[in-house]
Amino acid sequence: MELGLEKLARKLGHRFGDFSLLTEALTHRSVSVGHNNERLEFLGDSILNCIISDELYQRFPQASEGQLTRLRATLVKGETLAEMAMELDICDYLRLGVGELKSGGSRRPSILADALEAIVAAIYIDGGMDTCRSLVVAWFTKRLDTISLDKIKKDPKTQLQEYLQAHKLDLPEYTIVSVNGEAHQQFFSVNCVIEALEITTLGEGISRRKAEQEAAEKAIQELPKKP
């Protein structure tokens, strides 16, 4: 067991039988291409979605599939997971390469969110689904207790699409303008073009989806200005 991980384990609320799982979950690709947290992150993403989906299904019996999807998206989006990782002090235990450390990687939302998902998988493998579910629900309790159907809204791309359909206009076209950065840490720039309204907006983000959402949100802000 590496020094300090026992303290993190207590913070997480789980006594690991195999601390190498926790070490792997904290290891960024910049440290080791072949032995890092990417596989655990892949598994943890699915487990987290399953647990939160089930919890929302039980808590909101009258919610539609679309409403449940938006509730889940709010809870498991990268920004939320990064906030939780900070609350759990995961940032203090990340294993990063020299370059990532110098560039502030321990506070980068995408790295924090990925590490939290990897830790979820590590706990699942080490302690089983029941243990993992109990801990995840405990971590999310405050957010689960405060989220409501009144507080959720459709994402910008959906809002824009519905507006255009209601006005019998062609849907927007999203085009990648540029992609910068390493393969595991890319930054996207995307144009959203609505030809009928002569609107063109630029969105940026750490994924194509995030860039498209930002571009759509900017386009929505321009809609009232157009006849």
Model-identified regions with their sequence ranges:
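Double-stranded RNA-binding/processing signature
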Residues: 1-227
